[in-house]
Amino acid sequence: MPRSFLVKSKKAHTYHQPRVQEDEPLWPPALTPVPRDQAPSNSPVLSTLFPNQCLDWTNLKREPELEQDQNLARMAPAPEGPIVLSRPQDGDSPLSDSPPFYKPSFSWDTLATTYGHSYRQAPSTMQSAFLEHSVSLYGSPLVPSTEPALDFSLRYSPGMDAYHCVKCNKVFSTPHGLEVHVRRSHSGTRPFACDICGKTFGHAVSLEQHTHVHSQERSFECRMCGKAFKRSSTLSTHLLIHSDTRPYPCQFCGKRFHQKSDMKKHTYIHTGEKPHKCQVCGKAFSQSSNLITHSRKHTGFKPFSCELCTKGFQRKVDLRRHRESQHNLK
């Protein structure tokens, strides 16, 4: 057997010795516990704090910090008998105001949190400290807030779950809808243009939907009259004709419309507003369709052509008149 196994370890049978918990205080020589029979006769027994032990206050003196640190570094033997603590002398602080038996090496004032507050040792209970912490985090309903109130008319109204445009007071349910509205109506920029007709849009999705207008495919057919459409939204609007549903009335003349956009365009006749302005000559129009037709004068684009003489026209109404007058077609 190797020699290392024959040598007795110094740590052997340590379980027979009294153990000291890591969280228990280290007793300096001044606080070395003494048996009960060696304590003075007038020493009070702190049965409420230590049922089986008492502490001796006779040798409790304030020592310099250097000597106290050296004494705390030493390991004192565990007490075998009860610990007796004598009454403090005159001039010392009473028991309620005296420091605890184990004094931490740090200060509670230096324990600052990330919220800019510092904790202080609560004199009574821990509940007051937790309550103070929660009030510092979430605020007290009894204390008026120093922050300004939200401007519900600016962007967002929590009570109504709506987003308001500050220029036209139009209401949107999502911030994305408000952003698109501002870019289309108030920014004056429509960066997405159609390569075929030159029509501009404020959003790429609108341009993608517009490209179906130039295609000949009509995949959305009405089941009532058989009319086909290129876009599903156009079919939905067409179905309102069969149901004779006109939920949007004009506030000036009472005329009703199938769509809200048609009603809004109609109100421009009464108000005289012309929000659609030509970027080339500055001429303004009340309808966006009129601006599109006007822009073809500057670009020379003629999307409507006669199948008999291949003559092109900028407006569809001009093509119909040409067929009636030149080719006697209706």
UniProtKB/Swiss-Prot annotation:
GO biological-process terms attached to the record: chromatin organization; negative regulation of G1/S transition of mitotic cell cycle; negative regulation of transcription by RNA polymerase II; regulation of hemopoiesis; regulation of transcription by RNA polymerase II
GO CC, alphabetical: nuclear matrix; nucleoplasm; nucleus; plasma membrane; transcription regulator complex
SMART domains the record matches: ZnF_C2H2
InterPro entries: Znf_C2H2_sf, Znf_C2H2_type
One Gene Ontology MF term: DNA-binding transcription factor activity, RNA polymerase II-specific
Post-translational modification, as annotated: Methylation at Lys-8 in the SNAG domain seems required for the recruitment of the corepressor complex.
Tagged with keyword Lipid metabolism: no
Region (Mediates interaction with GATA1): 164-330
Compartment annotation: Nucleus
Major subcellular location class: nucleus
SUPFAM superfamilies on file: beta-beta-alpha zinc fingers (SSF57667)
Induction context: By GATA1 which binds to GFI1B promoter in cooperation with the transcription factor NFYA. Target gene of transcription factor E2-alpha/TCF3 that promotes growth arrest and apoptosis in lymphomas.
Ranges where the record places region Interaction with ARIH2: 91-330
Domain of life, source organism: Eukaryota
Region (Disordered): 1-42
Chain positions found as N6,N6-dimethyllysine: 8
Illness the protein is tied to: Bleeding disorder, platelet-type, 17: An autosomal dominant disorder characterized by increased bleeding tendency due to platelet dysfunction, and associated with macrothrombocytopenia and red cell anisopoikilocytosis. Platelets appear abnormal on light microscopy, while electron microscopy shows a heterogeneous decrease of alpha granules within platelets. Bone marrow biopsy shows increased numbers of abnormal megakaryocytes, suggesting a defect in megakaryopoiesis and platelet production.
Record note on quaternary structure: Component of a RCOR-GFI-KDM1A-HDAC complex. Interacts directly with RCOR1, KDM1A and HDAC2. Forms a complex with GATA1. Interacts with histone methyltransferases EHMT2 and SUV39H1. Interacts with ARIH2 (via RING-type 2). Interacts with RUNX1T1.
PANTHER family in the cross-refs: FI21258P1-RELATED, ZINC FINGER AND SCAN DOMAIN-CONTAINING
Domain statement: The zinc finger domains are essential for erythroid expansion and acts as an activation domain whereas non finger domain serves as repression domain. The SNAG domain of GFIs is required for nuclear location and for interaction with some corepressors.
Functional summary from the UniProt entry: Essential proto-oncogenic transcriptional regulator necessary for development and differentiation of erythroid and megakaryocytic lineages. Component of a RCOR-GFI-KDM1A-HDAC complex that suppresses, via histone deacetylase (HDAC) recruitment, a number of genes implicated in multilineage blood cell development and controls hematopoietic differentiation. Transcriptional repressor or activator depending on both promoter and cell type context; represses promoter activity of SOCS1 and SOCS3 and thus, may regulate cytokine signaling pathways.
Protein name: Zinc finger protein Gfi-1b
